[in-house]
């Protein structure tokens, strides 16, 4: 990182609750992908980013998503992942980032009873993370409504 880049999460103008959650997770400085992406996402720009595994890509989109979610209790962000394992991993990470906020995230994927997911979706979920097949199933059943989606992430 150069001296002109943001060096601490607090300097990225993040909510104190998010900075606190990141500190609890053991993170003090953003990775290069996070330092590059977070400000652009917070400014409302579309971002296409690529980085190696383990560089913090999930937090690069998860942090600004959590910061941008409003108190409205409807789905505001949709994150699509290719596998159920990644959906679970992303949901856990986003939930940790938003643990001090009132943001609710839910993974939806096949291989699990859909009824359980339908019930959970009624609990004011704001971020849904899922695999394409299960997301299509929910959309066709009208258990996921896309009316209020402000953010779409293809992971």
Put a short name on every predicted segment.
Residues 1-9, 64-80, 84:
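Long, low-complexity, intrinsically disordered polar/charged segments
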Residues 2-50:
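Conserved pre-motif I regulatory segment
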Residues 17-20, 24-27, 73-143, 148-151:
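Conserved nucleic-acid-binding Ia/Ib motif block in the N-terminal RecA-like helicase ATPase lobe
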Residues 32, 60, 129:
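Short aromatic/basic micro-patch
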Residues 35-47, 58-72, 85-88, 92-97, ...:
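Walker A/P-loop NTP-binding motif
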Residues 51-55:
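The conserved Walker
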């Amino acid at each position: 990182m150069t001296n002109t880049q943001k060096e601490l999460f607090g300097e990225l103008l993040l909510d104190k609750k998010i900075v606190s959650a990141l500190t609890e997770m053991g993170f003090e400085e953003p990775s290069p992908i996070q330092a590059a992406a977070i400000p652009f996402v917070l400014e409302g720009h579309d971002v296409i980013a690529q980085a190696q595994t383990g560089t913090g890509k999930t937090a690069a989109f998860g942090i600004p998503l959590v910061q941008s979610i409003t108190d409205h209790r409807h789905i505001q962000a949709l994150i699509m992942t290719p596998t159920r394992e990644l959906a679970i991993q992303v949901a856990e990470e986003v939930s940790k980032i938003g643990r001090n906020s009132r943001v609710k995230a839910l993974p939806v994927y096949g291989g699990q009873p859909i009824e359980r997911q339908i019930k959970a979706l009624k609990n004011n979920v704001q971020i849904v993370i899922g695999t394409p097949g299960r997301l299509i199933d929910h959309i066709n059943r009208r258990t996921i409504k896309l009316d209020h989606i402000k953010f779409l992430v293809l992971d």
